[in-house]
Design a protein with these regions (language model features):
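Short, low-complexity patches enriched in S/T/P/G
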Residues: 11-17
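Alpha-helical structural elements
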Residues: 12, 116, 173, 184, ...
């Protein structure tokens, strides 16, 4: 059965707020009615006017209080053969973060996918690792993951033995296959994530078929939807502030408003008119029975002012007005979804926070809170860092430990010597003793083949360039420079 946070109380509209917040009060009143009377199936209520979130928080749809839709939907059609994706470009941000540009035949465009590599990626080059996909919100950018821009995801996963997969882009897409192109984009995200990308991750980037998926807001909705539409594909699925009902009363109209506000898209081109069966065929609530056997984590705040919100002059209300309404909507649909899982005897973890709006600090917290459950589902519950600084590297590490951080791996063999990985870089043996390679230069060194590549072993630590405008590492057969203007360059 679902496990719940026992310290949470239902939210309501009992505070007499000001006239300017009448819409929010009405929304809360409707939701209180749903929570009090309708967790097993609420009567439909008219949809209040949704609000859009302030940047940079990604927005979720702002639905009306949902009524319980039918408990089943037609299964997804058997997939037709799909040509595999193809990597057209690769860029190493660091020695542990790499960006791939993958040509998607179904979308006829390149999709950027970043990977945060597993802790032992370099130390154990013959091993494969589980994978965890992290989906973005409604306002997903085309150049960078919101997780990277707004959270400490890169640091959090450094010591974990999982390949973290970050698809870039997909604004307002719900990571699904749209019926028609819109705004110059032919969204086929489900095809990409389920069929075009996996062979690349598993054949070329040492990922196993043990997979998890998490998302915030729109990405949380998509995580549950994709897991339900593809039973068994994911071992773990998590929704942080997701909207987990698509086809209930008023929901298609609310989603239409959200995707228009989130980028000028038309949800009719996604699933068709509200009467189209596609709405139910993608509804996590309707598809809940398909999640049997998947480890589930569902969380939301309640829209009340929390630790990461700025209080307004209205009691209990944050200044992030749109984030208030969106999080309340997430709360209600998440509770309805949890009740549906209970009805079907599907276990999971439902966490209802006593405060918090629809914004990034809360999603970063949930990412960290969900990890133990994700680790267990991915077979990593007993995984932990087990290393000491190698004696040959101790003196250099002692002098630089503030920058390098703690060790992640024991030392291991590389062509012509050995290396050891730390939180913020690596130490290699070399002709002039152990040397540090880190940051963007460390990424370029991996791209150049590392100690066994064309540059050979390092001859220096990273140091200022002669003109003082950048940084440089010297190697046996060349050097790598970095400047803020030009990035990294490999030179002879």
């Amino acid at each position: 059965m679902m496990r719940r946070n026992s310290g949470t109380r239902p939210f309501g509209a009992r505070v007499a707020w000001r006239t300017v917040m009448a819409a929010v009060v009405a929304m809360m009143a409707v939701m209180t009615l749903v929570v009090g009377q309708g967790l097993a199936g609420a009567e439909p209520a008219p949809a209040p006017a949704p609000a859009s979130p302030a940047a940079p928080a990604p927005a979720s749809p702002a639905p009306a209080s949902p009524a319980a839709p039918p408990s089943s939907a037609a299964p997804a059609a058997a997939p037709a053969p799909v040509p595999p994706g193809k990597v057209t470009n690769t860029y190493w941000y660091t020695d542990r973060r790499v960006a791939l540009w993958v040509y998607s035949p179904s979308m006829n465009t390149n999709i950027q996918v970043q990977i945060l590599l597993a802790r032992d990626w370099h130390a154990k080059p013959k091993e494969k690792f589980p994978q965890l996909t992290m989906l973005d919100g409604l306002r997903a950018q085309d150049d960078q993951s919101g997780w990277v821009l707004n959270t400490k995801i890169v640091d959090f996963y450094k010591d974990k033995n999982v390949n973290v997969i970050l698809p870039i882009g997909g604004e307002s897409s719900f990571y699904t296959d749209w019926k028609e192109p819109d705004r110059g984009k032919n969204y086929k995200w489900e095809t990409f994530l389920m069929r075009e990308l996996p062979p690349i991750l598993e054949n070329d980037w040492r990922s196993t078929d043990v997979r998890g998926i998490e998302g915030l807001s729109m990405g949380g909705s998509a995580a549950m939807m994709l897991a339900a539409r593809n039973p068994g594909f994911y071992k773990f699925a998590a929704s942080f502030s997701g909207i987990l009902q698509f086809s209930s009363f008023g929901m298609p109209q609310a989603i239409q408003f959200a995707v228009r506000d989130g980028g000028g898209y038309d949800s009719m081109k996604m699933f068709g008119p509200p009467s189209d069966p596609a709405w139910k065929e993608h509804d996590p609530y309707v598809l809940a029975d398909k999640l049997q056997g998947t480890s589930l984590y569902i969380s939301s705040g309640n829209g009340m002012v929390g630790a990461h919100d700025k209080p307004s002059d209205i009691p209990l209300l944050a200044t992030n007005y749109s984030g208030v309404g969106l999080e309340m909507l997430s709360r209600v649909t998440s509770q309805q979804f949890a009740v549906q899982l209970n009805r079907k005897g599907i276990p999971g973890q439902a966490v209802y926070r006593p405060s918090g709006t629809h914004t990034w600090p809360y999603w970063e917290f949930e990412m960290m809170q969900a990890w133990p459950q994700a680790a267990a589902a991915l077979g990593l519950s007993r995984d932990a860092v087990a290393c000491r600084v190698d004696g040959a590297f101790r003196k250099l590490w002692d002098a630089n430990k503030g920058d390098l951080g703690g060790c992640l791996t024991p030392s291991y063999g590389v062509p012509g010597g050995k290396a050891q990985d730390f939180a913020n870089g690596r130490i290699f043996t070399g002709p002039k003793g152990p040397k540090i390679v880190t940051g963007a230069i460390g990424g370029a060194y991996v791209a150049a083949g590392g100690p066994g590549g064309r540059l050979g072993k390092p001859l220096s630590n990273e140091e200022p360039t002669r003109d003082g405008k950048g940084r440089v590492n010297y190697f046996e057969h060349g050097r790598i420079t970095w400047t803020a203007k030009d990035g990294t360059k490999v030179l002879k």
